[in-house]
Each structure stands twice: as structure tokens, then as C-alpha cells.
Regions:
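Bergerat-fold GHKL/Histidine-kinase-like ATPase
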Residues: 1-222
Length: 222
């Protein structure tokens, strides 16, 4: 049976091995320590054989060879709605996440443009769902729109709101790389160059999945 450590002295001994400082009495959070790893084995298989991505694009994905970069990417991919998102507290009882990887912070200034967009979409939809008197308006992506999701099973025939945007590579911003969004999200085997990507998230601001869903997206967005 695996049980958590609860002895502060024992925990401190482990933290000292890795020169990691413990949280102060007023701090809460999660620290991920990955010791004694085989880097090559851990990063193996990020891009499987016959994934449909060109060798040139794979070569641009430097995160495939660097664990710190890969963790930064993974955090943004799954927690983008809350990473340094100070606007989220205006529309829900959620706190923004202050994330550091090897001591380096992830902020809105250095997030990858794709996940900065994901964050703005989430905040826009959250604002619409809360019926905010002053709905959130993205400065970075002003073309984001919100639509209601119809449902005959709920009062008001509405299940909430979804935020969406049609965007070009140039509109993603100067920091946008030549790496395809499908590559970042590991959506291999897409049928066209502009299949709509649907993001599913849960209340605390954690993303559950990204999927290519052409029929649902086109049915919702007229």
C-alpha cells in the first residue's frame, strides 16, 4: 500500500536532497519533483512513426529533446485557463496559477500563442456563463465570440456558452511559431488543414481533452 508522507521532518529531509524549498505557512500549491530520470527514455515516442508530421516540423519541436521545455508545454496544454490568468477571479471562485519550471516562471508574456488563445477562449466562455454585467473582452484576441449551447433538457433551453474564434497564423501574433496547432496537441491523422479543434474543460480550469469535431463545431457556429 502506498501512503503519503505526513512527517514534516521526513519531508524536509527529502526536499534537502534536491535543494527544494518548502512552501511557507501561507502558501498552497503542488511541487513536482522528477528525480533520477532517463531523459531519452522519458521523451521517447512523443512523435510516433507515421504520425503524418514532416521531419522539418518535428525538427522545430525542440521540446521533444528537452524535459524542462516539455513540462512547460504540458502545463500550458492542460492548465492554460489558469496559468497566470489574473482575470479568472473576476468571474469565478478560482485562483490563477503561478507556475515555475526549474525556477523560470510561465506568464502571459512567454506562453506559447496557441495556449494564450486557449486561455482567452476559456475566460470569455466563463464570463458569458456567469452572465457578467461587463463580459470579458480579450485584448489579445478581440475576434473571440461566444454563443449559447442549446439544450431542450434544461430550463431555458440553454446548457451554457462556448467561445470560438476563426483565426489565421498571422492573427496568432508575432510570437507564433511555424509549428502547427495540431502538432502541439498531438492530433495526428487530421483530414484537412483547418479542421476545427474543440477544447473540453472542467470547472477548476483544467482541460480534459482536445478533439477534432467538425460536425459539432459547425453546427454550433453559424
Amino acid at each position: 500500500e502506498i501512503l503519503p508522507l505526513t512527517s514534516e521532518a521526513e519531508i524536509q529531509t527529502i526536499l534537502d536532497i534536491f535543494s527544494v524549498k518548502k512552501f511557507s505557512p501561507t502558501q498552497t500549491g503542488t511541487a513536482i519533483i522528477i528525480p533520477y530520470i532517463n531523459k531519452a527514455r522519458l521523451l521517447h515516442g512523443i512523435f510516433p512513426d507515421n504520425c503524418g508530421i514532416t521531419a522539418e516540423e518535428i525538427a522545430m519541436c525542440t521540446f521533444k529533446d528537452d524535459i524542462a521545455q516539455y513540462i512547460e508545454l504540458a502545463v500550458q496544454k492542460w492548465y492554460a485557463p489558469r496559468v497566470y490568468n489574473k482575470a479568472v477571479k473576476e468571474y469565478a471562485a478560482q485562483k490563477w496559477l503561478a507556475v515555475r519550471v526549474n525556477g523560470n516562471p510561465i506568464t502571459d508574456a512567454n506562453m506559447r500563442p496557441l495556449f494564450r488563445l486557449v486561455q482567452e477562449l476559456y475566460t470569455s466562455a466563463l464570463s458569458a456563463n456567469q452572465g457578467a454585467t461587463q463580459p470579458y473582452k480579450s485584448k489579445a484576441f478581440p475576434f473571440i465570440k461566444c454563443v449559447s449551447i442549446p439544450s431542450q433538457k434544461l430550463t431555458g433551453n440553454k446548457a451554457g456558452h462556448a467561445a470560438y474564434i476563426r483565426i489565421t497564423k498571422d492573427e496568432m501574433g508575432a510570437g507564433s511559431s511555424s509549428i502547427n496547432p495540431y502538432t502541439y496537441l498531438r492530433l495526428f491523422g487530421k483530414t484537412s488543414l483547418n479542421d476545427p479543434i474543440v477544447m473540453f474543460a472542467r470547472t477548476p480550469g483544467m482541460i480534459l481533452d482536445y478533439k477534432i469535431d467538425d460536425k459539432w463545431a459547425k453546427g454550433l457556429i453559424k
